[in-house]
């Protein structure tokens, strides 16, 4: 069973208007908007030259962006969330072990995973959020 199908199963019997994800700032994402977002992320990834057999490492703090990025990315390819508190040595171990094609980080992050990814020639993708979007949605 493909990961796209597994992620889709999560939402099969949900009310589209109900809240899927909320944040401390009282920002809310409905199941309908989350489904659309996941489909959009999957389409964006497929248009980048990344294969659904590739892996992505995600280095984000717990919260809506981590949840939505994991769901969106794992609907297309393997996604491996990594603890943003890891030290360089830990990132080097996990990134060598995972061998991801891409690493997802917050825009303007100074997380040590970025330097390790550069050293290992892993593409770095920074999440771009917009103030007019609910927490967890990004480009």
Language-model segments: which ranges?
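Flexible, low-complexity linker/hinge segments
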Residues: 1, 129-139
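AMP-dependent adenylate-forming
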Residues: 7-30
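Adenylate-forming
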Residues: 10-13, 34, 38, 45, ...
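Conserved AMP-binding A3 loop
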Residues: 30-32, 139
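Short beta->alpha linker loops
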Residues: 33, 61-62, 86, 107-109, ...
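Conserved AMP-binding/adenylate-forming
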Residues: 42-86, 98
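Conserved ATP-dependent adenylate/AMP-binding module captured primarily in the ANL superfamily
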Residues: 51, 86-115, 134-137
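Internal alpha/beta domain cores that form substrate/cofactor-binding pockets in large enzymes
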Residues: 57, 79-82, 94-98, 111-130
């Amino acid at each position: 069973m493909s990961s796209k199908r597994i992620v889709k199963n999560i939402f099969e019997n949900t009310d589209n208007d109900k809240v899927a994800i909320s944040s401390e700032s009282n920002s809310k994402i409905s199941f309908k908007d989350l489904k659309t977002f996941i489909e959009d992320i999957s389409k964006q990834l497929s248009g980048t030259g990344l294969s659904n057999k590739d892996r992505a490492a995600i280095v984000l703090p717990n919260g809506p962006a981590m949840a939505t990025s994991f769901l969106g990315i794992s609907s297309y390819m393997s996604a491996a969330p990594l603890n943003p508190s890891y030290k360089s040595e830990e990132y080097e171990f996990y990134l060598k072990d995972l061998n991801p094609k891409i690493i997802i980080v917050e825009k303007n992050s100074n997380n040590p995973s970025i330097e390790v990814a550069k050293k290992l020639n892993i593409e770095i993708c920074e999440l771009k959020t917009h103030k007019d979007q609910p927490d967890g949605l990004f480009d």
